[in-house]
Amino acid sequence: MRVAIIDYGSGNLRSATKAFERAAREGGISAEIDLTADADRVRTADRIVLPGVGAYADCAAGLRAVDGMWEAVEDVAIAQSRPFLGICVGMQLMSERGLEKTVTHGFGWISGDVKEITPTDPALKIPQIGWNTIELRRQHPLFAGIPTGPEGLHAYFVHSYHLDAKKPDEILAVADYGGPVTAAVARDNLVGTQFHPEKSQALGLALITNFLRWRP
């Protein structure tokens, strides 16, 4: 099995690659973790990971700037229905639009727009940086075997925007940051996390392992 982590100049690429390598090694999973900027290698991968940090518009432009990459991601994730994981802004790009700086169109796989988080508590700063407990809205193989509650579902966030998903059945998990924040989304063979699995220690390692074993 080959897992393509897409390198388009955005995301915690080194730490993400090492986290996937560790998850495969410790989980006894035979997997080649391939950090690549080659669209052809993405097209032939068994599963793909799209990281991303920074502004939505910048990440969308960066991905489109890599020759054939936007189309390759759509081909693998939609036409071929292979497992896809979006991380942080990589998850946000699964949405219809991003409203940061300007209106930017995403892949349109998850209904809704990416909007600024607006906590009701003025003491809560933007961006949200640090640990937060997430709450599952439904069961999913991505979270199989992970204890519920603050001990198990403890994730690391760095963001000012979140995917305001329109369809409740596409919301997998939420966090409370002065109001509900979308923490994870899922549809068919597609999953995305607003938090960073590669920085989320036990939860992140378990989640990555589950993704590598997932057979949607």
From Swiss-Prot:
It is found in: Cytoplasm. Heterodimer of HisH and HisF. This is Imidazole glycerol phosphate synthase subunit HisH. IGPS catalyzes the conversion of PRFAR and glutamine to IGP, AICAR and glutamate. The HisH subunit catalyzes the hydrolysis of glutamine to glutamate and ammonia as part of the synthesis of IGP and AICAR. The resulting ammonia molecule is channeled to the active site of HisF. Keywords: Amino-acid biosynthesis, Cytoplasm, Glutamine amidotransferase, Histidine biosynthesis, Hydrolase, Lyase. Coiled coil: none annotated. The keyword Hydrolase applies. It comes from the Bacteria. CDD domains: GATase1_IGP_Synthase. GO terms for cellular component: cytoplasm. It catalyses: 5-[(5-phospho-1-deoxy-D-ribulos-1-ylimino)methylamino]-1-(5-phospho-beta-D-ribosyl)imidazole-4-carboxamide + L-glutamine = D-erythro-1-(imidazol-4-yl)glycerol 3-phosphate + 5-amino-1-(5-phospho-beta-D-ribosyl)imidazole-4-carboxamide + L-glutamate + H(+); L-glutamine + H2O = L-glutamate + NH4(+). InterPro entries: Class_I_gatase-like, GATASE, Imidazole-glycPsynth_HisH.
